[in-house]
Design a protein with these regions (language model features):
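Alpha-helical structural modules in large enzymes and assemblies
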Residues: 1-485
Length: 485
């Protein structure tokens, strides 16, 4: 059954022009290292990401991972002339994957010279935010205190009972590698400040147990009453929704470099808008607060505003550097509809030259002529993203007229921007290979994973059930006859 599904995928890849590979690894419930291979390509103008297989590995070094990927690619691209089909490979930014000398991407590129490496942009967004938090001590302290809220309520069911009584919802756990959890924690604490204050006061008064809980509840209560903490919480409450939006966009299967450029511009504009509100974030000091005992070291409002400006600048600068479209991804800027009018006045010759060097299968002179026509026509300036422009050209029956543009658009759409599909496959792995089924073979694991991950593809496959029956019927001689003529 698993081989039948793979043969259908092989047939799809045979009919497509370009292919990209996505790979990542994780540890299953049996503590075995599992590497997943996903193939991305176009089917009838729509991008698909097909699960190929899980591969159990004894070692997680670059050579072992590259051999696994090469073994999978050699099955879907068996001929030497097919190697030019592989135009992209997407992994995380670990050195074993991204190393220029001995990394997986460099080893794969030796056999597939057009397979350009893409560092998963969802991972890069996580790195941007980690840099913004770690470089400023006050913000690092703020997130340390903030994570204390979720940690406090994960230690005891009795504490959770107080939380359910006052707040009515649980606090998300803080995870370093998943910044959407950090943003949810910020939003939850901000929206339920009064309820959390009531909860901690209730614990301090009515707790019957260890004094550690009372001491920690008192400390968290002081955080919620601290003016600096609330100011930083207000700032990140304005930032995090935009992070959530971008994080969700980076997990779309239909994401292409051109659309990601628009997402990049929107995110930078949103951060700049929040940056302009920084002087009004910290509330004025009331007479009651001035009469209270002040801490020995107090940070002025000007200094706190400077800190938040610094955090905003760090986010923007690191975001621009990590989301910079250079080398092979510079070709995405050729289809930025907002720049078509400017390109009509001054053609981007340098970007076109870089694109032709990255993808030798393109005819540079013909591509230049076709792009010049697109830049001069108003109807193409309404398209947002490479997918929309490709569909417009196909619906207008212009595939032959703009053959090189179509080819470049297919390359851009096929190029993956994130390895989110690998994370989704790992979720399926946890559901399929559980503690009670931890001794299943790799063939059975891949078969069950294929049925779960690619169920829509299998349902749409012609005569799939009949072919499975015929395969089992011909495996060996049986007493019962499964095939009737």
């Amino acid at each position: 059954m698993f081989k039948i599904a793979q043969s259908d995928i092989q047939q799809e890849i045979k009919d497509t022009k370009f292919l990209a590979v996505i790979s990542d690894d994780t540890t299953d419930v049996s503590n075995h290292l599992q590497n997943v291979v996903i193939l991305r390509y176009l089917v009838s103008g729509q991008v698909v990401e097909r699960f190929w297989s899980f591969c159990s590995m004894k070692q997680g070094d670059a050579v072992s991972i590259a051999n696994v990927i090469d073994a999978c690619l050699s099955r879907v691209l068996p001929n030497a002339e097919d190697k030019s089909k592989l135009i992209a490979q997407c992994y995380d930014g670990a050195s074993v994957m991204s190393g220029l000398e001995g990394g997986v991407q460099s080893i794969v590129k030796q056999s597939y010279p057009h397979a350009h490496y893409v560092h998963c942009y969802a991972h890069q967004l996580n790195l941007v935010l980690q840099q913004a938090v770690s470089q400023v001590s006050q913000i690092r302290l703020f997130f340390a205190n903030l994570s204390g809220f979720s940690v406090f309520f994960t230690r005891s069911p009795k504490r959770v009972a107080f939380l359910d009584k006052s707040v009515g919802r649980r606090l998300p756990r803080s995870v370093k590698t998943r910044w959407n959890f950090q943003s949810r924690l910020v939003l939850t604490v901000y929206e339920h400040q009064d309820d959390l204050i009531e909860c901690f006061q209730d614990i301090i008064v009515n707790w019957n147990g260890d004094q550690t809980t009372v001491r920690e509840a008192s400390g968290l209560l002081k955080c919620l009453q601290d003016r600096d903490f609330l100011g930083y919480l207000d700032f990140f409450h304005k930032i995090m929704p935009h992070v959530e939006i971008l994080y969700a966009q980076l997990q779309r299967r239909q994401l292409d470099p051109v659309f990601l450029q628009n997402c990049k511009s929107n995110f930078i504009q949103a951060v700049n808008n929040v940056r302009s509100t920084i002087p009004h974030i910290f509330p004025p000091i009331t007479p009651a607060s001035t009469s209270a005992k002040r801490p020995r070291v107090d940070t002025s409002d000007e200094e706190k505003s400077r800190i938040l400006h610094e955090v905003s600048d760090i986010i923007i600068s690191h975001f621009c550097s990590r989301f910079e479209f250079s080398n092979h991804l510079a070709s995405a800027t050729l289809f930025n509809s907002e720049s078509f009018e400017k390109y009509n006045q001054a053609f981007p010759s340098q970007i076109l030259k870089s694109t032709a060097e990255s993808y030798p299968m393109l005819d540079e002179s013909k591509l230049r002529s076709e792009l010049a026509v697109i830049y001069s026509r108003c109807e193409f300036r309404q398209c947002c993203g490479a997918v929309a422009l490709l569909h417009l050209l196909q619906e207008s029956n212009l595939t032959e007229t703009f053959s090189e543009v179509i080819k470049l658009l297919m390359i851009l759409i096929t190029t993956p921007m994130s390895s989110s599909e690998a994370e989704r496959c790992f979720s399926t792995l946890k559901r399929v290979k559980t503690f009670l089924r931890n001794t299943m073979s790799d063939d059975r694991l891949n078969a069950l994973a294929m049925l779960s991950i690619e169920k829509k593809f299998i349902r749409e496959s012609s005569n799939f059930n009949q072919r499975v029956i015929e395969m089992f019927a011909h495996l060996k001689e049986r007493r019962a006859t499964f095939l009737y003529k």
